[in-house]
């Protein structure tokens, strides 16, 4: 128990009057953690809640529920249970979907019962497997360190207090304390890469050193420190701004970054904004204007760079529609309001035109022209280029018409005709 109690001291985890939610499966690891907690917390019957999700992947999964009911009843601990309906099981990627459903259940339970800490029974062998798995799949140090020792899930702090324990140590703990548990038979199969690493690779590595768990923990701490340093450096830079369907920044803000830093910076931006790991390694090898990586696109255009999540690009509504002033309306996945008055919201532009209560809005068709102050017309694509708007984003720029003439194009153009009777229209966006 010394290593267990040290975890809370080292990480400044307050215990008194705090609520703990244990994600339990009925396996040897979570049973050991349950037993440690009921012997560690000052008032476990009031401080501890156990959450169990039956994934409905095995016929005998009901045995886990029976065991947890027996354990929690014996110690007067609240047990919350839920099943993952078979109808929701996907044909592919079931592990990822199961994890997603499980953490949604835990987040909901934590919020409902105002929990302070969520605990999982991940241990040192899990950490080793995770490092090897992510090394094989990506080689990204940030991904290899994805099993954080202390993290967050919604409003709860996520704790993994068994991370310095090996699997063998936990099995010995269960045996010494006479604890029953359920073995998941699928863990003994070789159908997944994680299981093959567990059965064949990790045992070989353990033969080479008695400090494998300790070394994995040290690697995790070192990787976390390096990641924090890198993130602090990137946060010190001038960061891009939200630009409708993209992030937009100035190329001049990147001039002090070398190619490796540049690639890492864009990886960082994608993860910060969309919580996906991508690698713009191609920046290191090729000089070009557009880079595509999975569902993301990086564009260098004129004086700007753009990061676009193409999954967030909604179908273009090509038809004009009539809207009323001072009433919110949606267009191409964005919400706007146009008013003569000042409103609460993000003012993205304004224009002057004849007074009316109704306007036409939509996307500017290709080939359109815009009227200049001297009465001549210019091609809209020229104005888009002057303002550094790439082709893929142009249809998402709000256009407003009066009397069939464009009087406003978001981030590009405002009516240049003058008339003493014109009034000002303010354009607000609500993201």
Curated annotation (Swiss-Prot):
Alphabetized, the UniProt keywords read: ATP-binding, Cytoplasm, Ligase, Nucleotide-binding, tRNA processing
Stored SUPFAM superfamilies: Adenine nucleotide alpha hydrolases-like
Q: Which EC number applies?
A: 6.3.4.19
Family matches, as InterPro entries: Rossmann-like_a/b/a_fold, TilS/TtcA_N, tRNA_Ile_lys_synt, tRNA_Ile_lys_synt_N
Q: Cellular component terms, GO, for this chain's entry?
A: cytoplasm
Kindly list the places in or outside the cell where this protein is found, as annotated in its UniProt entry: Cytoplasm
Q: Which GO terms describe its biological process?
A: tRNA modification
**Is this entry keyworded tRNA processing?**
yes
For the keyword Lyase, the answer is no
Any one GO molecular function term: ATP binding
The task this protein performs is described as: Ligates lysine onto the cytidine present at position 34 of the AUA codon-specific tRNA(Ile) that contains the anticodon CAU, in an ATP-dependent manner. Cytidine is converted to lysidine, thus changing the amino acid specificity of the tRNA from methionine to isoleucine.
Under PANTHER family, the record lists: TRNA(ILE)-LYSIDINE SYNTHASE-RELATED
UniProt-recorded name of the protein? tRNA(Ile)-lysidine synthase
Gene for this chain = tilS
